[in-house]
């Protein structure tokens, strides 16, 4: 509830150097995929991440014959009630797919990640499971023909050891979508009953800390 309040009600901005680095790498990948740049056009960690992305791309090509890029930064917007039970027919779920691949047996929804570690892999996979369902509904593609893939391209140690690795993490057949749907239904419940949201928020530890600091 605290995250919902900060991002959707109080509209707190969020900036950090990791986000800046990730955005720069994403923009560069877009240019490279569309033939407007090469990894060697960049420097430092951005170049290293781009070189890792090319290695990961080649790895996917070796595992999925006929692999080619369909689109990048692909907007996917579908009615909310097409992916979950909802009494709000006007609500739309929006998302953006980093890269969509097509191969001889189906599609791959890829997500470039510049995280220094894999500890948030389950969160990323949950997000991709949502995009998978959304793309399936949008383009009428059976879900069993869509694979999801988190592509880590800047894996590092907490203490700088010089490591700068990559990993292709293919989604499992068992989808984490039900976990996301449970969270979504809770938020929809708050929309229907705002008092329940306030009760949950006031009981939340982060809000209590914030409230105590505000009294100082």
Label every PLM stretch briefly.
Residues 7-11, 31-39, 194-197, 201-208:
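Short loop/turn hinge sites at secondary-structure boundaries
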Residues 1-35:
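Charged, glycine-rich intrinsically disordered N-terminal tails and low-complexity linkers that flank
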Residues 125-137:
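An active-site-proximal "capping" alpha-helix that borders the catalytic cofactor pocket
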Residues 81, 135-216:
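Metal-dependent nuclease catalytic regions and adjoining charged, substrate-binding loops involved
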Residues 17-21, 117-125:
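Active-site metal-coordination segments of metallo-dependent hydrolases
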Residues 10-11, 15, 83-91, 165-171:
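Short, polar loop/linker segments at the starts of domains and inter-domain junctions
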Residues 28-115, 119, 137-147, 158:
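Catalytic cores of nuclease domains that cleave nucleic-acid phosphodiester backbones
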